[in-house]
Amino acid sequence: MDYDLLRSKKSIKRVESTKSNPWWWDSHIGLKNSKWLENNLDEMDRSVKRMVKLIEEDADSFAKKAEMYYQSRPELIALVDEFHRMYRALAERYENITGELRKGSPLELQSQGSGLSDISASDLSALWTSNEVNRLGRPPSGRRAPGFEYFLGNGGLPSDLYHKDGDDSASITDSELESDDSSVTNYPGYVSIGSDFQSLSKRIMDLEIELREAKERLRMQLEGNTESLLPRVKSETKFVDFPAKLAACEQELKDVNEKLQNSEDQIYILKSQLARYLPSGLDDEQSEGAASTQELDIETLSEELRITSLRLREAEKQNGIMRKEVEKSKSDDAKLKSLQDMLESAQKEAAAWKSKASADKREVVKLLDRISMLKSSLAGRDHEIRDLKTALSDAEEKIFPEKAQVKADIAKLLEEKIHRDDQFKELEANVRYLEDERRKVNNEKIEEEEKLKSEIEVLTLEKVEKGRCIETLSRKVSELESEISRLGSEIKARDDRTMEMEKEVEKQRRELEEVAEEKREVIRQLCFSLDYSRDEYKRLRIAFSGHPPTRPSSILAS
């Protein structure tokens, strides 16, 4: 078995030295793992959006539309070229990946061998462990290669792997091969195996050949053991009960030793009896018969002793073999435990990779849908480009007469613009002149207002003075009236003296007339002053309000 394990390890190293690294498949097929694919798709989306924006961009007039078309035409052509380049790159990448997948289609594996039932499960597990120990260093692929279940079986039980007669072996049916062939291009997890599938298939074939050779050697080695070992090797437990077998052998060895000891004791007793009876020299028949009987017993015991010694040596050999097998079974138990742990971890990783494979499959389906959508979009864009080229040629034919008319209109508008510019300059000069005049008028108005304010102040002072004079005259008039009333009373008092004093009255009358004349003169002067003050006040008020002044009254004129 050690030789087989060593040879298996050497073959694994030889096969792994020729293996290629399949991890680049993941970076080329998944959108999340491929930076190149993600960048190209983003750039394609941006280019399509820019192209649609340039195509749908609107203008106010046909001339402006034509000008915009001439300006955006090179950019549109560049965008279409870039879009076509990225599409071709994606198509080539997809074609390369699908081609590699078709090349890596699985081959039919048929394992044929005889006498596989003679191999114990521990030997098979150890052999498989030696072949797979280096391979578990990287994550397992999402899809098991054909023949993987053949080596593992249902939970590692050899009863599921082989028939009892040991002549039949597991094979792959046609339906399984068809499903494998169809899953090459439809199942994304298979991409993780990639280009090293052929080397893996070759490796599996080598392992099958080595298993057959190891099986033959083990069968030849196990043929020399006792028949009691064969049912234990073939049992579903896959392990020989070596401790129980060792205990049975030890017990059998003890019994044989006890029998040997008893035989030796009997031989010693018989020899002592023979030595005691031989010197007597009895020549009678009874003594001779007893001696012959003792000799027969000695020979029988010697034969039994020889047989027992042979059996003891055989038992000791078997005991040594059993001890070696027990030690080997202990190491096989440790290997089996490690193999079971590795198998559980491998199954967990296989489940994880299966989930990842389903996610990758969904991503690939989305990518294929997106590629088909981009193909249809590209066809639509090609039709739009052809329509735009047709519209451009029609527009170029129709735009020449309109262009001449537009040039004439532009020349006429330029002349009108020059004329309007001259008029605008004249208007600006007039506006500046009017602004200067307005400033002058405002300055004169301010000066006039200041002058009028000063005159109003003077007139106000005069009015105050005249008011005082009027008050003084009013007091004088009141005094005169009081004097008149006093004189009237005196006249009444002196009525009696009228006659007597006619001269005196006449004189007084003349004086009174003179006083009255003076009074009238004073009143007339006061009225004249009042009228003059009133007229001056009205004239000032009218001057303030902006009306032309009126002439003085007739009283002032008189």
Swiss-Prot record:
Pfam families per UniProt: KIP1 (PF07765)
InterPro entries: NAB, NET_actin-binding_domain
Domain of life: Eukaryota
Tissue/organ expression: Expressed in the epidermis of the root meristem and the early expansion zone.
Occurrences of domain NAB (ranges): 21-101
Coiled coil ranges: 194-363, 421-527
Subcellular location: Vacuole membrane
GO cellular component, one term: vacuolar membrane
Keywords: Coiled coil, Membrane, Vacuole
Major place of residence: membrane
Entry text on domains: The NAB domain, also called NAB (NET actin-binding) domain, is sufficient for F-actin binding.
Function: Plant-specific actin binding protein. Associates with F-actin at the tonoplast. May be part of a membrane-cytoskeletal adapter complex.
Similarity comment: Belongs to the NET family.
Protein name: Protein NETWORKED 4A
Source species of the chain: Arabidopsis thaliana
